[in-house]
């Protein structure tokens, strides 16, 4: 029987005890890409923050490889899951390579010393995101788009079984958006990594997703294959499009 990497059970999420979304049901297997879509403020980031343990569920449970999230130690979780968020991290005198190398720390000893193999993994992670040319630059001095690529490299460097990304295509030009999604697809297909990612671009979501979870303006949740979710009527309803329509041919709202 194939293992399930991420599964929710009667999940309710929100803030300060107030439920924002309830009855959230998802199931992600190794090698699958789940894309969360929906308008701003719908709750995509809130769901992701519960998966990565930044927030605690108000109700129900989240299971990672059959274990509740609260049963993992911090180090165990870091070896299992890597995360790319939209929030900017604070760094002091760190090069881009230093930031990427942080992805290896769950595997290091008490002193945090990297082995030769660790250093090779750092280099390979930088290469995958086309960032070897900026590895020695100060992380605080590079562009937002370059920072996003470095944060993806750090996540890759962790060698995760699950990767969670919150709007990773923000700040990227179209070339680097496509490159990023190609990397995620490669991780899913070749390494059997389970990918959970939120995206704004419906047309990109339709191309990369194995499954889609769409959170509507009215907090309704639709889950299914892209071909069943990305229909003119369903997307128009979920996004509350009253003066325009979703064009499934072009993957855009008009």
Where are these regions (language model features)?
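Conserved ABC ATPase "signature" region
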Residues: 101, 116-134
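Conserved ABC transporter NBD signature motif
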Residues: 60-68, 77
């Amino acid at each position: 029987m194939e293992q399930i990497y991420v599964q929710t059970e009667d999940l309710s999420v929100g803030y300060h005890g107030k439920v924002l979304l309830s009855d959230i049901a998802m199931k992600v297997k190794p090698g699958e890409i789940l894309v969360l879509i929906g308008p701003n403020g719908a709750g995509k980031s809130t769901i992701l923050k519960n998966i990565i343990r930044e927030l605690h569920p108000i109700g129900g449970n989240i299971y990672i490889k059959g274990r509740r999230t609260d049963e993992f130690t911090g180090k165990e979780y870091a070896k299992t899951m890597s995360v790319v968020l939209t929030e900017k991290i604070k760094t002091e005198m760190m090069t881009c390579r230093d930031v990427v190398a942080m992805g290896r720390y769950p595997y290091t000893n008490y002193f945090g010393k990297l082995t030769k193999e660790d250093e090779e993994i750092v280099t390979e992670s930088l290469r995958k995101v086309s960032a070897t040319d900026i590895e020695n630059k100060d992380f605080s001095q590079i562009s937002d788009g370059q920072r996003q690529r470095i944060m993806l490299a750090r996540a890759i460097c962790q060698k995760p079984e699950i990767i969670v990304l919150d709007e990773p295509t923000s700040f990227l030009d179209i070339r680097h958006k496509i490159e990023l999604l190609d990397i995620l697809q490669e991780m899913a297909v070749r390494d059997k990594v389970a990918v959970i990612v939120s995206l704004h671009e419906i047309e990109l979501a339709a191309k990369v997703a194995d499954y889609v979870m769409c959170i509507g303006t009215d907090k309704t949740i639709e889950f299914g294959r892209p071909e069943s979710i990305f229909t003119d009527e369903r997307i128009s309803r979920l996004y509350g499009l009253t003066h325009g329509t979703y064009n499934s041919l072009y993957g855009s709202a008009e």
